């Protein structure tokens, strides 16, 4: 997972695997 996706998911409350 890239930094941008991780940031968005963190804000959304979703953790990408």
UniProtKB/Swiss-Prot annotation:
Entry keywords, A to Z: Secreted
Family designation: Belongs to the Frog skin active peptide (FSAP) family. Septenin subfamily.
Tissue: Expressed in skin glands.
Keyword presence, Secreted: yes
Function: May act as an antimicrobial peptide.
Protein name per Swiss-Prot or TrEMBL: Septenin 1c
Annotated compartments: Secreted
């Amino acid at each position: 997972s890239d930094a941008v996706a991780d940031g968005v998911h963190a804000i959304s409350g979703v953790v990408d695997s």
